[in-house]
Regions:
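Sec-dependent N-terminal signal peptides
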Residues: 4-13
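Flexible coil/turn and secondary-structure edge motifs
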Residues: 18-190
Length: 190
């Protein structure tokens, strides 16, 4: 009986410990397919989900989001293990995968739904974001136009958007190349 109790205690304790290490962060950086590819490569990232956030319509659909009828941005939900990576590191990955100076969207995707947004869930995150923006502005002597918004709700995008870069590899590469994403990023970040 003691063994069973110890095993159950260990399972419950380790599950709670694991759950407390699991965190989420939300970034909008233009096309969520490209953002998903970038963050899936980061050590400590457990899962990425393409979706929508920041708007006023509940359960939005892609066709409405890209018509700018919902107030939502194409957003990536990133689930990560905070014992391996942290908010600051993920924010660094975010910056080098967007053009923080483009007020009209990202790369070849223009419009409200493609603008860059960093969502925060608490004041600590907000301060980290604001400091990082100041550092970028000082480095480049340019104004960062990425929005900083309080996170409210996330809606998962349609299934065909999830892992698009893996499921539609050739089509995705053509899109990415056509948007000159890597060229623009190299020009900005080196």
């Amino acid at each position: 009986m003691k063994k069973i109790f110890l095993i159950l205690f260990f399972i419950i304790f380790s599950t709670n410990l694991y759950a407390s290490n699991i965190k989420k962060v939300y970034f909008a950086g233009g096309c969520f397919w490209c953002m998903e590819e970038s963050f899936d490569k980061v050590k400590g990232v457990i899962e990425t989900i393409s979706g929508y956030s920041g708007g006023h319509v509940k359960n939005p659909k892609y066709k409405d989001v890209v018509k700018n009828n919902t107030g939502h941005y194409e957003t990536l939900e990133i689930t990560y293990d905070s014992t391996i990576t942290n908010f600051e590191k993920l924010l660094e990955v975010y910056w080098i995968n967007i053009d923080p100076f483009d007020a009209n969207g990202q790369f070849c995707d223009k419009g409200e739904s493609y603008k860059s947004v960093v969502f925060y869930e608490n004041n600590d995150q907000k301060k980290i974001i604001e400091t990082s923006i100041k550092n970028i502005e000082n480095r480049f002597n340019r104004k960062v136009v990425t929005y900083v918004k309080n996170f409210k709700e996330f809606y998962m995008a349609e299934t065909y958007h999830q892992d698009y870069y893996e499921k539609n590899f050739i089509r995705y590469l053509m899109y990415k190349k056509g948007c000159q994403r890597e060229e623009v990023l190299n020009k900005i970040w080196g």
